[in-house]
Amino acid sequence: MFKVGEKYKIYKNITAELKEKKWVKAVAEHIPEHERFVRFRLHFTNMYGENSSYVESYTMSELTEMMKSGELVRA
């Protein structure tokens, strides 16, 4: 289903205070052998206009729900 190096877009909350959602570029970075979760590196531009990234992991059930709702798409 997911492969290391594949690019995706995730629609997620950027600022918790404003409940603002934006599309964030994501690359599948690591998938363990048991395949229960996928670790993504998320790339975005911060409020100062600088490019930044961080790592976030999602379980397979979370990713399935995100795909069904349209919050996760292939780039």
Which residue stretches match the model-derived regions?
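Short beta-strand-centered aromatic/proline hotspots
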Residues: 16-32
